[in-house]
UniProtKB/Swiss-Prot annotation:
Residue numbers covered by the propeptide annotation in the UniProt entry: 19-246
Documented EC number(s): 3.4.24.-
Family indicated by similarity: Belongs to the peptidase M36 family.
UniProt-annotated catalytic positions: E430
One of the record's GO molecular function terms: metalloendopeptidase activity
Keyword terms: Glycoprotein, Hydrolase, Metal-binding, Metalloprotease, Protease, Secreted, Signal, Virulence, Zinc, Zymogen
Name assigned to this protein: Probable extracellular metalloproteinase 3
Cofactor(s) named in the record: Zn(2+)
Annotated signal sequence range: 1-18
Lineage of the organism: Eukaryota, Fungi, Dikarya, Ascomycota, Pezizomycotina
Gene from which this protein is expressed: MEP3
Main location class: secreted
Length: 633
């Protein structure tokens, strides 16, 4: 095995800070005068945590001989005996022993696309917890497939293009039958990175009724959209989901957040057991470049959609060592270093998340899954110095089996300009969008963080992991961190407040969300709570600043890694499009599954500090805060 030498890729802590005048992601939609926020549907999900579930299922009869999918199916049938549904083909058992099964409600054989039911089965084979957003209103009596009075899918495509002002030419579009019921692929279009698609589905509307819609999928680079166009009126759009998540940060190498924290060093064979083929092979082919099973990294100065033939540094002896200087300009002069850095950070994070349970069955990003479950052929496509934008980054997360795509931009906020690939926190934040979108709602559903509050938590998880990874041995609970400070050339970073356990430094509370209308702002509130949680667990269990956790019976033995594990396990437990209260309950349930609730009161105290305590309630316009603890704490 050849040693892999990566210059400038030392373990780096990641963080992202913010200033009051927060920068917002720019993309195709916003540049074309379209506000995607106006198309978001409200949260519908309910979550029954493990305590409530234990009481409910006492009256239900389950056979000891049932497998976990059968047990989950029986629960759905007993909860909604008059509903029809299908099992989504993405169930798996997590590393914490919890089985995760997802269901999609149907009507007349068509999916109700935002009607989901997730069931979590414990090690004992019993229902552990569950959540759902099933439609409870009246199903249309008439089967639309009989009279077929709905519009042609081509009209729906044209309606989506017009409503969202998309850069897609559809005048000559023709619909070709694809796999699935009433599913089509469009030929004869230009402007999209891949052929647009459409399939006929129902959608729950805000008024509580069902709409028959064409779900039109268009990948236009900065936005990878699912547009729900009314099947009877192609000028009406009911909802838009964007697989692309944007952020505002930048970084350098593992343990080092950016070039201000250290110098490039050479690291030999940095992969862990999570990458059995190493980082430069997919088990079938060995690559003398920045390509392997988990990721493929390349230069993309034009911002184009192709990547296979793009430039990558070549090294037959697998020594990727290239010069870099903080005064070097333009960034393209050190593109070899940049691509290598991005490749290292992406792979290193893949391996860490794998140890926490984001593996093949859970929907991670790999070409070759080695018969370990999940769908392969979906490494992360990571573009360095992408020319399609500046001062930002994004990550597109399609369902398991399709590659994720990260675009890292240059930042014009300093002279010389700075390269986002060198701020690890930005890379980690972006990749975390892939993690949360694959886990929440199951690997086959990447549309479970598209409401305002759940989308905000998606941003918050990215900031949390970026910050947790950058912690230093000298840090204490009084240490504050920013997000994206180096890339933005602003010590305050790109968030409204620093991440701090001090309520004077960061005054965000649960009820602060009542006045926030943007996902990065809401995400800062959520990440602030998780930052408090991390320090509470560090105080309870001690902190280790090694790159990888030490496990005992599947439990990380230090508070920092334990917080990362519990937060990740909570993503898989919570319902599709959760709110803060449900995500908190899912973290508590994750602790019950992993440690038998050994950290219950510690977790409650951390959330109660910022008003998400016992008795806190969700209401889209008037959230109720609480600093109380439950009985027994």
């Amino acid at each position: 095995m050849h040693g892999l030498l990566l210059a400038g890729l030392l373990a780096l802590p990641m963080n992202v800070l913010a200033h009051p005048a927060e920068q917002h992601a720019s993309n195709v939609l916003s540049r074309r005068g379209v506000d995607i926020e106006s198309f978001r549907l409200p949260l519908k999900a309910k979550y029954m945590d493990s305590d409530a579930t234990a009481q409910k299922i006492q009256a239900m009869s389950f056979s000891k001989d049932d497998d976990y999918v059968s047990t989950a199916t029986k629960l759905v049938k007993s909860t909604f005996p008059k509903s029809t549904f299908r099992v989504v083909d993405d169930h798996y058992i997590g590393t914490n022993g919890i089985g995760h099964v997802h269901f999609k409600q149907t009507a007349h054989g068509l999916d109700i696309d935002n009607s989901d039911f997730n069931v979590n089965i414990g090690r004992d084979g019993k229902v552990f917890s569950f959540g759902n957003s099933f439609f409870t209103g009246e199903i249309p009596k008439e089967n639309p497939m009989v009279k077929r009075a709905f519009s042609d899918p081509v009209k729906a495509l044209k309606g989506a293009v017009k409503a969202l002002n998309l850069p897609v030419k559809s005048d000559n579009a023709k619909a070709k039958t694809a796999a699935g019921k009433e599913a089509f692929e469009f030929m004869g279009t230009t402007g999209a990175l891949s052929a647009p698609k459409a399939n006929l589905v129902y959608l729950q509307k805000e008024d509580g009724s069902l709409a028959l819609t064409w779900k039109v999928e268009t990948d236009v680079g900065d936005n990878w959209l699912l547009t729900y166009v009314d099947a009877h009126n192609s000028e009406t759009v009911h909802n838009v989901v964007d697989y692309v998540a944007s952020a505002e940060y930048k970084v350098f190498a593992w343990g080092l957040n950016d070039p201000t924290e250290g110098n490039p060093t050479s690291i030999r064979d940095p992969w862990t057991d999570a990458s059995p083929y190493t980082w430069n092979s997919d088990g079938m082919t060995k690559y003398p470049t920045t390509r392997g099973n988990n990721a493929i990294a390349q230069d993309n100065p034009t911002g184009g959609s192709t990547y296979i033939n793009n430039y990558r540094p070549q090294s037959p002896n697998l020594i990727f060592s290239y010069p870099w200087s903080p005064t070097a300009t333009p960034p393209s002069s050190y593109k070899d270093f940049s691509i290598t850095q991005l490749f290292y950070t992406t792979n290193r994070y893949h391996d860490l998340l794998y140890s926490f349970g984001f593996n093949e069955a859970a929907g991670n990003f790999q070409v070759n899954n080695g018969n370990k479950g999940g769908r392969g052929n979906d490494f992360a496509i990571v573009n360095a110095q992408d020319g399609s934008g500046t001062n930002n980054a994004n990550f597109a997360t399609p369902p398991d089996g399709s590659p994720g795509r990260m675009r890292m931009y240059n930042w014009t906020t300093a002279r010389p300009n700075r390269d986002g690939c060198l701020e690890a926190g930005i890379v980690i934040h972006e990749y975390t969008h892939g993690l949360s979108n694959r886990l929440c709602g199951g690997p086959a559903n990447s549309a479970c963080l598209n409401a305002l509050e759940s989308g905000g938590m998606g941003e918050g998880w990215g900031d949390f992991y970026a910050t947790a990874i950058r912690l230093k041995p000298r840090d204490t609970k009084d240490t504050n961190y920013s997000m994206g400070a180096w890339a933005a050339n602003n010590p305050k970073g790109i968030r409204a407040y620093l991440y701090s356990t001090n309520l004077q430094t960061n005054p965000y509370m649960y009820t602060s969300v009542n006045s926030l209308r943007e996902v990065h702002q809401i995400g800062t509130v959520w990440a602030s709570m998780l930052y408090d949680l991390m320090w509470a667990l560090i105080e309870a269990h001690g902190g280790t600043y090694s790159a990888d956790p030490v496990f005992r019976n599947g439990v990380p033995q230090d508070g920092r890694h334990l917080s990362m594990k519990l937060v990740m396990d909570g993503m898989a437990l919570q319902p599709c499009n959760p709110n803060f209260v449900q995500a908190r309950d899912a973290i508590l349930d994750a602790d019950r599954a992993l440690t038998n609730s050994a950290n219950k009161c510690t977790i409650w105290k951390a959330f109660a500090k910022r008003g998400l305590g016992y008795g806190a309630k969700y209401d889209a316009r008037n959230r109720t805060g609480s600093n109380k603890l439950p009985p027994g704490c």
